[in-house]
């Protein structure tokens, strides 16, 4: 890494020699080279950006100097209008300078990213050419620090040598399971007819890579997702949860079909499949909320940027000796604050709406798949309840609704199992049972309170919210058990 950062031209020769001397270290060496080359490329672009920023600031200082001269002249003459004009001109220059610096920095970041990818791809390609036997390890190492460059190299190699594409995928995944996603994407782009075979090969040598591969298959090749998932499941049965979850995260629309196919092939995997989908559903909901939060922040920032010039000018006008100008400035600032507050309120409202919709979607997806898995393997109900409570408590209500619909005779046991596995999921679980099976509400609440006494208050509150008429009776039964 140090050599690559200091002298990128010599880095490939040094790194290749190191990798040839210690093949087991090829991935680590490649990661270091990729990191170092990227640092060097970014440093060069950053230097250019800094120079451009200095020129922007120098130009702004010149304009501000001219305005300050006008300011001094206006002060001496006592001209209120000229003074206000000078202050406004300075505010405009400062605002324009800030915008120019933001634009320059953004362009610099984009240029730095492009330069780092180009430089990394070039030097890593040279390493592979000089040490082809370590190609997979070199790519896997590169992916750890610069996945975009690694993906570019992999796709080029697969297009030039399709016969070795499957083996390359397996070798990359074995060296770095986290690189399975880029390998899957590359083979879909270059040799889609080999994608199923490649994903199975990756899962066989690196079960930890199966989830990422399944996610990419579902997203980019949904028509092959089911067959690929079953091939991976056969190669790595222990990865069933990750595979089902990957499919659900990559493309929720095909999750049910794929999960059913997987369960039909191996009913014993039903609990793992249901859990994997529940975890993915919860993650999808969290991602949607995060996206809504980022969008809301961007909208507020856009409003603030649109008001920046007016705010800057108004702040300058506050120094005026003319009370009318000061009053107008104060009104402008108050209006700006109101507009920003409105944007913030609208953002919070949008976030809340997305949170509700995302949570409902997650509950529905997790519940639908859990129900299908219970039908495929009725003996898996308790295991599904336990694993979901532990791994995806945010979907507990949806899964308990599935229990109530598919296996109501196991609802009390499943609810108690959930509470025992994760008391934090108890409230949502008992609320679902109370709404779906009110005749079992008391029995379920008591069983859950026995399994998780620390969650008794949450259980009682959830019951009261779901069925106020029965709350007193259920609370009394819970109190008797506690006593």
Q: How would you describe each model-predicted region?
A:
Residues 1-483:
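General marker for long, soluble alpha-helical cores
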């Amino acid at each position: 890494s140090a050599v690559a950062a200091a002298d990128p031209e010599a880095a490939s020769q040094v790194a290749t020699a190191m990798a040839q001397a210690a093949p087991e270290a090829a991935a680590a060496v490649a990661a270091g080279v990729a990191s170092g080359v990227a640092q060097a490329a970014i440093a060069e672009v950053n230097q250019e950006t800094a120079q451009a920023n200095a020129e922007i600031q120098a130009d702004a200082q010149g304009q501000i100097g001219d305005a300050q001269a006008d300011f001094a002249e206006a002060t001496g003459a006592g001209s209120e209008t000229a003074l206000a004009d000078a202050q406004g001109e300075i505010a405009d220059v400062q605002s324009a300078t800030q915008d120019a610096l933001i634009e320059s920095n953004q362009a610099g970041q984009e240029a730095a990213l492009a330069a780092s990818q180009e430089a990394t791809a070039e030097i890593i390609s040279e390493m592979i050419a000089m040490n082809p036997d370590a190609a997979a390890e070199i790519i896997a190492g590169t992916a750890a620090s610069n996945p975009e460059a690694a993906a570019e190299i992999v796709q080029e190699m697969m297009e030039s040598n399709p016969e070795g594409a499957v083996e390359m995928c397996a070798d990359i995944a074995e060296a770095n399971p986290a690189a399975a996603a880029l390998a899957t994407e590359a083979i879909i782009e270059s040799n889609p007819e080999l994608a199923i075979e490649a994903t199975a090969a990756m899962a066989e040598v690196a079960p930890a890579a199966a989830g990422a591969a399944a996610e990419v298959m579902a997203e980019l090749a949904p028509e092959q997702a089911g067959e690929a998932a079953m091939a991976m499941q056969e190669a790595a049965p222990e990865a069933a949860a990750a595979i089902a979850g990957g499919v659900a995260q990559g493309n929720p629309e095909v999750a049910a079909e794929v999960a059913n196919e997987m369960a039909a092939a191996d009913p014993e995997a039903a609990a793992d499949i249901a859990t994997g989908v529940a975890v993915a559903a919860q993650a999808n909901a969290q991602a949607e909320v995060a996206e809504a939060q980022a969008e809301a922040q961007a909208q507020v920032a856009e409003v603030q940027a649109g008001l920046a010039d007016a705010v800057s000018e108004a702040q300058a006008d506050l120094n005026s000796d003319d009370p009318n100008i000061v009053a107008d400035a104060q009104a402008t600032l108050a209006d700006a604050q109101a507009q920003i507050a409105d944007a913030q309120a609208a953002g919070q409202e949008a976030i809340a709406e997305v949170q509700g919709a995302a949570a409902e979607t997650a509950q529905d997806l997790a519940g639908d798949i859990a129900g299908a898995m219970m039908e495929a393997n009725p003996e898996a109900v308790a295991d599904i309840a336990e694993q979901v409570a532990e791994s995806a408590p945010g979907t507990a209500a949806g899964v308990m609704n599935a229990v109530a619909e598919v296996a109501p005779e196991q609802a009390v046991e499943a609810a108690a199992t959930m509470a025992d596995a994760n008391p934090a999921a108890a409230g949502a679980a008992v609320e679902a049972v109370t709404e779906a099976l009110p005749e079992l509400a008391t029995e379920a609440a008591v069983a859950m309170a026995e399994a998780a006494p620390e969650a008794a208050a949450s259980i009682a509150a959830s019951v009261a919210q779901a069925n106020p008429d029965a709350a007193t009776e259920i609370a009394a039964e819970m109190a008797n058990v506690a006593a």
